[in-house]
Amino acid sequence: MARIMMKKAHNESISEAFEGFMLSAQSRGLTDKTLASYRTHFHSISKRLDIEKPISQLTKKDLEEMIAKMREENLTDTSINSYTRTLKVFFSWRNEERIL
């Protein structure tokens, strides 16, 4: 099956990009539990990362600062690892779709 390439606007926010990720995840048939987990994780991430920032301007430093905030708030390593794992899946999807 041919892949449909869609060009994304350079000013797409992290939040908008995540909604695209969720739509794709839903269309691929991921379980409701997985989708709910992604949403919960993104909600937590959004408390520590400016999700209205254009995704094209997201830097490694932004992510490191987010993780540092989580550590300052005494989140467990398990929680932090869960949130970063969700971000890794999100970024992998963006890369696979060639929209990073």
Name each region found by the language model.
Residues 2-5, 19-33, 39-100:
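N-terminal core-binding DNA-recognition domain of tyrosine recombinases/integrases
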Residues 6-15:
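A detector for short, charged/polar N-terminal pre-domain segments
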